[in-house]
């Protein structure tokens, strides 16, 4: 599973050096090739009007990509060179798109040309996937599928030449200032589109990118959404918002009174259930933009850790598969949840606890032993801490001279839960 950082709010296209340094220093190895940065929705909105000032201030080549799509690669080439120098990969790209509330109904062919050139850029940048949003402006609802069918099939021919996969993405639409479900926000519709397109081209050329923020704005059950689309999901955009207004915040930052508005539980459960192992795109552009450049390095480290947390939660069974033998530390609620969800498939040898009253007893079918018993286990046995005092317990075990592999377990996003909690002194 690739973790991919979005450049918005972090990397300037004019002076990208510092942003690239912040990205690589925090441990990111992949960056989204966001081509909409070089041809923004705002630029497209003004296409055909006087944009001389924009040409002078934002384009080193003094041209607008919206007017000259074939110059897209020449425009991004200097940035790609710096990405390569910094050993940053670009596994996935994002094609230019229109504003959600656009007034332009005459740009379908322009968007096609931009998407075509974006696919060609993918071939030169090493990107395997490209996210291309559906056409919507100026199209009657009953014609949306037929218009987009022709749009994507035309692009599919170019994508096949370069062995690039095109990903559709779930959309919101704005009606009188309110965000509601748009094209491909219904999982059944998205499934139909992808399957039909793949059937017509005779191969798996199309897939899906799930935008978590859009699902949240549309008030959707993410687990059901994911289970409907299954393996068609090749990429997931991780971003937080309050469920009412469009924003791209770092996950877990749009919470109130310890409650997250985003359905992270449904997301992780769903992705875990389908065995997701695709592209995990972290978009926290609004969070990044609001922080001082002086704090950016620390923010980037938190962002990387957050993305790694999602990767770990989604693939939690990978951790359990790595070791033939496991011992748990903790004989409480977390241990009970482990045994309920994974005890049969990955049975531990026993569990330990610091509470001497529990030593020699049985808990969830496991013998509870004192921590000192860990000195007798084989070197290849993994110790899995099932207690929220992770780092304190890890330090305790290291101070005891235990050199075994120690990992943490979390029951925050289990397939199922107990509805009661054990209370122990």
Give, region by region, the residue ranges found by the protein language model.
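Generic enzyme active-site microenvironment
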Residues: 32, 167-169, 209-211, 216, ...
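Active-site-proximal loop/turn and secondary-structure-junction residues that shape catalytic pockets
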Residues: 9, 35-39, 96-99, 134-138, ...
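Histidine-acidic metal/acid-base catalytic patches
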Residues: 1-27, 46, 184-324, 417-424
């Amino acid at each position: 599973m690739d973790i991919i950082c979005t450049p918005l709010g972090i990397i300037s296209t004019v002076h990208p050096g510092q942003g690239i340094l912040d990205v690589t220093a925090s441990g990111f190895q992949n960056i989204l090739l966001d081509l909409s940065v070089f041809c923004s929705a705002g630029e497209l909105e003004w296409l055909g009007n006087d944009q001389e000032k924009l040409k002078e201030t934002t384009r080193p080549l003094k041209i607008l990509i919206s007017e000259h799509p074939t110059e897209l690669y020449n425009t991004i080439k200097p940035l790609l060179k710096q990405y390569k120098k910094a050993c940053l990969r670009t596994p996935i790209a994002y094609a230019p798109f229109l504003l959600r509330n656009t007034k332009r109904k005459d740009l379908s062919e322009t968007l096609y040309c931009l998407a075509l050139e974006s696919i060609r850029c993918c071939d030169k940048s090493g990107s395997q996937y490209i996210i291309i949003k559906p056409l919507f402006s100026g199209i009657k609802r009953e014609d949306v599928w037929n218009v987009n069918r022709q749009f994507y099939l035309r692009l599919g021919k170019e994508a096949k030449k370069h062995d690039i996969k095109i990903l559709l993405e779930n959309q919101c639409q704005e009606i009188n200032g309110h965000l509601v479900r748009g094209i491909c926000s219904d999982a059944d519709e998205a499934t139909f589109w992808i399957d039909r397109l793949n059937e017509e081209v005779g191969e798996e050329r199309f897939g899906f990118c799930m935008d978590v923020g859009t699902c949240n704005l549309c008030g959707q059950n993410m687990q059901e959404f994911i289970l409907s689309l299954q393996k068609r999901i090749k990429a997931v955009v991780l971003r937080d918002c309050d469920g009412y207004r469009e924003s791209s915040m770092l996950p877990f930052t749009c919470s109130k009174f310890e409650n997250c508005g985003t359905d992270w539980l449904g997301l992780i459960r769903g992705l875990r259930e389908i065995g997701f192992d695709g592209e995990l795109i972290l978009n926290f552009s609004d969070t990044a933009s609001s922080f001082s450049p002086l704090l950016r390095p620390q923010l980037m480290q938190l962002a990387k850790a957050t993305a790694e947390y999602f990767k770990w939660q989604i693939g939690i069974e990978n951790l359990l598969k790595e070791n033939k033998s496991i011992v748990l530390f903790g004989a409480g609620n977390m241990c009970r949840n482990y045994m309920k969800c994974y005890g049969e498939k990955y049975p531990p040898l026993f569990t330990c606890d610091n509470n001497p009253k529990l030593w020699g007893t049985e808990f969830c079918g496991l013998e509870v032993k004192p921590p000192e018993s860990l000195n007798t286990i084989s070197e290849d046995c993994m110790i899995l801490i099932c207690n929220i005092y992770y780092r304190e317990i890890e330090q305790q075990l290291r101070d005891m001279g235990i050199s075994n592999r120690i990992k943490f377990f979390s029951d925050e996003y289990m397939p199922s839960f107990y509805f009661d909690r054990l209370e122990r002194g």
